[in-house]
Amino acid sequence: MMTALSVLRKRLGFAKPFLEKLFSIEARAAEWWAAGAHHRLFLAQWGIFPLPEFFEHKVGLYWRWKATGQCYFVERGVFSLLAMEPGCKVLELCCGDGFNASYFYAARAGSIESVDFDPKAIAYAKRNFCAGNVTYRVADIRTAMPEGEFDNIIWDAAIEHFTETEIADLMVNIKKRLTASGILSGHTIVEQPDGQKMLPHHEYEFKSKEDLARFFRPHFRNVKVFETIYPDRRNL
């Protein structure tokens, strides 16, 4: 027996080509407007000092990915997601706007504790990227790294904001908080070939895969660092 909904859908069949064309035009217009709006937002945020403490990943999603062909903001989320087992307990350090926790990790993790020292970043994350198994809170990991034991700790696109001494000290605390089979994952940027920083506000940019690996080897038996290369940058 046909339901009222199925009858309505059948009767509207004659209008399907028109509706598809209409909504396709609407979708393209929305895409064009969203790209332009996020491009303008990017220019305002990163073209005028002071520079922000975190990157709004909607800029990457709606504008930068298509405009530049650079998808490293996506590869970061995917690489850490691949290290997770279903139901895992996750600590995300320096979470920024919360994009990765919501778009990537929340679907697989049992619980996620995401922290950042910037109250503006945490407020943004709570407004835009909330999920039932994600908790956002303000914390400076140099002095107040969350306690507990975690299956995964993610330090994504943030290690470069710390000095070499701070990185070494933080690695000790990270290791203490991982389970016996726990995994630390993350992403960072390589300095320019002439030794100059890619971004001036970074404390330390790594020179090579080996330069990054030296911070891990005192604490982990299994260390894997790989490089992805884009026209304007190299990532680890």
Regions found by a protein language model. Give the residues of each.
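Local beta-strand N-terminus motif with an aromatic residue
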Residues: 87, 150-151
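Short catalytic micro-motifs in class I SAM-dependent methyltransferases
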Residues: 157-158
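Class I (Rossmann-like) S-adenosyl-L-methionine-dependent methyltransferase catalytic domain
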Residues: 2-86, 91-145, 162-169, 173, ...
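A conserved beta-strand element that flanks and buttresses the S-adenosyl-L-methionine
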Residues: 154
